[in-house]
UniProtKB/Swiss-Prot annotation:
Consists of three domains; the N-terminal catalytic domain, the editing domain and the C-terminal C-Ala domain. The editing domain removes incorrectly charged amino acids, while the C-Ala domain, along with tRNA(Ala), serves as a bridge to cooperatively bring together the editing and aminoacylation centers thus stimulating deacylation of misacylated tRNAs. Belongs to the class-II aminoacyl-tRNA synthetase family. Transmembrane segments: none annotated. PANTHER family: ALANINE--TRNA LIGASE, CYTOPLASMIC, ALANYL-TRNA SYNTHETASE. It comes from the Bacteria. Pfam families: DHHA1, tRNA-synt_2c, tRNA_SAD. Catalyzes the attachment of alanine to tRNA(Ala) in a two-step reaction: alanine is first activated by ATP to form Ala-AMP and then transferred to the acceptor end of tRNA(Ala). Also edits incorrectly charged Ser-tRNA(Ala) and Gly-tRNA(Ala) via its editing domain. It is found in: Cytoplasm. The keyword Cytoplasm applies. It comes from Shouchella clausii (strain KSM-K16) (Alkalihalobacillus clausii). This is Alanine--tRNA ligase. Its cofactor is Zn(2+).
Length: 876
């Protein structure tokens, strides 16, 4: 058997099946495309469903692939076992109605045993088959030549996911030798049992039946082959490593982690395994467009990163570091998966940002969790309240799984039902806070069955003659509506744009012979028609009437300027910040535009200026805006940007702005960028993890914004007594220097007053067991002033315990100080201040020599300060 690298095994598998007439299917993105049933691509066959279910006929019915995959159903086992992974590769060969069982078995055996390929010793291989699959048994025994004792019949060898294709499967096992198990009394020591000796290296699925709805099975007219070989497991056998983690797929990551840790892989293998596995998953997922967040696949990434940080702390890594491993992952995989190496700067930036965000709250959260665990143990409780677990999640970003792991290490459990209840209450609060759209509230009841078409003519026309086909008032269809009624209606054709793609709906009016109505909103009905919401302002309106429908042209003109500007902004963001930028949301109205986009880190003022300059340059170049209908495949091949998650038909509307921007879009646009006039960014901010927002105005809105800003600047100049607007910065700088000088003088005076007040406290010193004790209320503006007084008193007394308190509004501030000789006798400022503050309903802590705290009940201050003397007496 050859000792091969992981890259060689992967390529060898593909080359073998290419020789057998298979076409190579490229590895798909981990983020599923048009498959809402999957959170991640989780197997080699997951991306080939379109072929197996007949939606697409492949050019070649023989397919081979190496597919990156993610499974996260048992994250807690990763690191604790030899072969659990969240990210892994599946090698597979597939037949869509072409070859079947005999050929699949023959080629599998050839690849594994022929010295031209893997070259395993034949005597090391065993197989399992389904008890009723005589065909597979006979072929393995008679054609391949496997002895009967190495063909094991197992009831579980049947691939079935419910209704749909199914069939028996045959698994191939490699015997790693007696050093991995030789107990003749072990009931699991056989191929297919739970043991480390016989490892499954390949699964051949023979899809030959259809599982019918009534539970019966009927033969498929076209039989299929679906095989899967886990690369990590196969490589561990070839490289003869105890677990998958010692292979060349993981060891470079583990070695890079060892260089940062205070211990070694040999001494703490679980932590290193967790980190190595999780960084592979996160790096590839981010490279494929997923970003950490609080829901869906983003939550999975956040959970993995935070779990890795937790294990990193156990090996002495107490800072953001996972991002430093991204180049290592990229280097291992670059030959076949170049995307991590190509995007490593962006991936590292995303991971670092997420790590830093978690580290900001981690220590505080751990301290809270430690207190919760301590209290539970002190009261002999075995369960942590769900309310406490939710507080850790909601306030400190602790995923519930992470809390459960910490708690489990302490021999406790979490009330998961209580946690879930708190989560549901939060969701209900969020739902209640969201405003429901009244115009759509009756759609499902009234309009769900309406199939009458409504043709949109608003791309070409701003008004049209139409027929009112359906009228609704309240939740009922009506034949007539009168002045004052709020109604919803369909027209057989309409110039009103229905809100979609971020563009707001048109407003306007309809006029009939007997009345008129003002249209306030338009949305898409369940069956795709444009549903108008309006108020009858004159006379009456009836179903079947002819109506003149007119939009507010001035508003539409402003909307189209902002919409085309949004396309220019999208491309400019990619040009300046990088190709990773993708649209995450938008609003296009007549007053402004808002654009949300994926990007980690701040957008610098210089970058923002570049973006604005690029958009304006394209506006002033007077680029033509061309709109065409194309086939989806052609548009994408031409480089048209499609919105992630948006569903497109086979034909799409393509908006091209000169040679600069190309997007799929159903919205309304200018005919030439010169119509936009001027583009001005009004704000830029972060609105969530990895998502930022730009707001901007165009044309008249940009002029008005700049006029307002100029007016504000003129007003500031007058107040600052600056002769010219250009003098304002210099005048501000001069005033700031005067302010800094005054602050320094104020601080000096405050310090002198503090020292004087501290000196007066020497009269309140009490000697207890040779220790100078001062516990007093003083006048101090803040905690810093208190600390200064305590420092002054510590310098005046060799062996002292000091607690000073000050009222700040309705609250209390405490600072405690203990001199070194007093610390040597067992006094501790942090422990003392915690008890003092607790007596006023507060809390705090700190070092042995200096600590601070806050209190909530000023009425109990005297009682709290009196405790200081009791504390000193208890130790003296």
């Amino acid at each position: 058997m050859q000792r091969l690298s992981s890259a060689s095994v992967r390529q060898m598998f593909i080359d073998f099946f290419k020789e057998k007439g298979h076409s190579v299917e490229p590895s798909a993105s981990l983020v599923p495309f048009e498959d809402p049933s999957l959170l991640w691509i989780n197997s080699g066959v997951a991306t080939l469903k379109k072929y197996f279910d007949g939606r697409v006929i492949p050019e070649n019915p023989r397919i081979v692939n190496a597919q990156k995959s993610i499974r996260t159903n048992d994250i807690e086992n990763v690191g604790k076992t030899a072969r659990h992974h969240t990210f892994f590769e599946m090698l597979g060969n597939f037949s869509i109605g072409d070859y079947f069982k005999e050929q699949a078995i023959e080629w599998a055996w050839e690849f594994l045993t022929d010295k031209k390929w893997i070259g395993f010793p034949q005597e090391r291989l065993s197989v399992t088959v389904h008890p009723e699959d005589e065909e597979a048994y006979r072929y393995w025994h008679q054609h391949i030549g496997l002895p009967e004792e190495r063909i094991i019949r197992l009831e579980g060898n049947f691939w079935d996911i419910g209704e749909g294709p199914s069939g028996p499967n045959s698994e191939i096992f490699y015997d790693r030798g007696p050093e991995y198990g030789d107990d003749p009394n072990d009931p699991e020591l056989y191929p297919g049992g739970e043991n480390e000796r016989y490892l499954e290296i390949w699964n051949l699925v023979f899809s030959q039946f259809n599982h019918n709805a009534d539970g019966t099975y009927t033969p498929l007219p076209k039989k299929n082959i679906d095989t899967g070989m886990g690369l990590e497991r196969m490589v561990s056998v070839i490289q003869d490593t105890p677990t998958n983690f010692e292979t060349d797929l993981f060891m470079p990551i583990i070695e890079a982690t060892e260089a940062l840790a205070s211990t070694t892989y040999k001494e703490a293998d679980t932590a290193f395994k967790v980190i190595a596995d999780h960084i592979r998953t996160v790096a590839f997922a981010v490279g494929d467009g997923a970003l950490p967040s609080n829901e869906g696949r983003g939550y999975v990434l956040r959970r993995l990163l935070r779990r890795a940080v937790r294990f990193a702390k156990s090996i002495g890594i107490d800072r953001p570091f996972m991002y430093e491993l991204v180049p290592v992952v990229g280097a291992i995989m670059k030959d076949f998966y170049p995307e991590v190496a190509d995007k490593q700067d962006f991936i590292a930036r995303v991971i670092r940002t997420e790590e830093e965000r978690f580290h900001e709250t981690l220590n505080e959260g751990l301290a809270i969790l430690s207190d919760i665990i301590e209290k539970a143990k002190a009261t002999n409780k075995e369960t942590i309240a769900g309310e406490d677990a939710f507080r850790l999640y909601d306030t400190y970003g602790f995923p519930i799984d992470l809390t459960e792991e910490y708690v489990h290490d302490e021999g406790l459990t979490v009330d998961r039902a209580g946690f879930d209840q708190e989560m549901e209450q939060q969701r209900q609060r969020a739902r209640a806070a969201r405003q429901e759209s009244a115009s759509m509230s009756v759609q499902e009841d009234v309009f769900g069955e309406v199939k009458t078409p409504s043709v949109f003519v608003g791309y070409e026309h701003t008004e049209t003659d139409a027929v009112i086909t359906t009228l609704v008032r309240g939740k009922e269809k009506v034949e007539q509506a009168v002045q004052g009624d709020v109604i919803q209606f369909f027209l057989d054709e309409t110039p009103f744009y229905a809100e979609s793609g971020g563009q707001v709906a048109d407003r306007g009016m309809i006029v009939t012979d007997t009345g008129q109505a003002v249209v306030k909103d338009v949305k898409k009905a369940p069956n795709g028609q444009h549903l108008h919401t309006a108020e009858v302002t004159i006379g009456e309106i009836s179903t079947g009437q002819q109506a003149s429908a007119r939009i507010e042209v001035r508003e539409r003109l402003d909307i189209v300027k902002n919409h085309t500007a949004t396309h220019l902004l999208h491309q400019a963001l990619k040009d300046v910040l990088g190709e990773h930028v993708n649209q995450a949301g938008s609003l296009v109205s007549s007053e402004r535009l808002r654009f949300d986009f994926s990007h980690f880190g701040q957008v610098t003022p210089n970058e923002l200026q570049q973006i604005e300059e690029i958009v304006n340059e394209k506006v002033w170049q007077a680029l033509p805006v061309d709109i065409s209908i194309q086939r989806l495949e052609e548009a994408k091949a031409a480089g048209a940007m499609a919105l992630f998650g948006e569903k497109y038909g086979s034909e799409v509307r393509v908006v091209r702005v000169g040679d600069y921007s190309l997007e799929l879009c159903g919205g309304c646009h200018v005919r030439n960028t010169a119509e936009i006039g001027l583009f001005k960014i009004t704000s830029e901010s972060g609105i969530g993890a990895g998502v930022r927002r730009i707001e901007a105005v165009t044309s008249k809105g940009a002029y008005q914004f700049l006029s307002e800003q100029t007016a504000i600047l003129k007003d500031a100049a007058e107040r600052l007594k600056a002769k010219r607007l250009s003098d304002v910065p210099q005048r501000i700088e001069s005033l700031q220097e005067e302010l800094r000088k005054a602050q320094r003088e104020n601080e000096s005076l405050t310090a002198k007053l503090g020292q004087a007040e501290a000196g007066n406290l020497n009269d309140q010193v009490k000697e207890i067991g040779g220790v100078a004790v001062i516990a007093a209320q003083v006048d101090a503006k803040d905690t810093e002033a208190l600390r200064s007084m305590v420092d002054t008193l510590k310098q005046a007394h060799e062996k002292a315990v000091i607690v000073l308190a000050a009222k700040t509004g309705n609250k209390l501030a405490f600072v405690a100080g203990v001199t070194k000789p007093a610390i040597a006798e067992g006094f501790h400022a942090g422990k003392l201040i915690k008890e003092v503050a607790a007596r006023t309903g507060g809390g705090g802590g700190g070092r042995p020599d200096m600590a601070q705290a806050g209190g909530k009940d000023p009425a109990k201050l005297d009682e709290a300060l009196a405790y200081v003397h009791e504390y000193v007496k208890s130790i003296s």
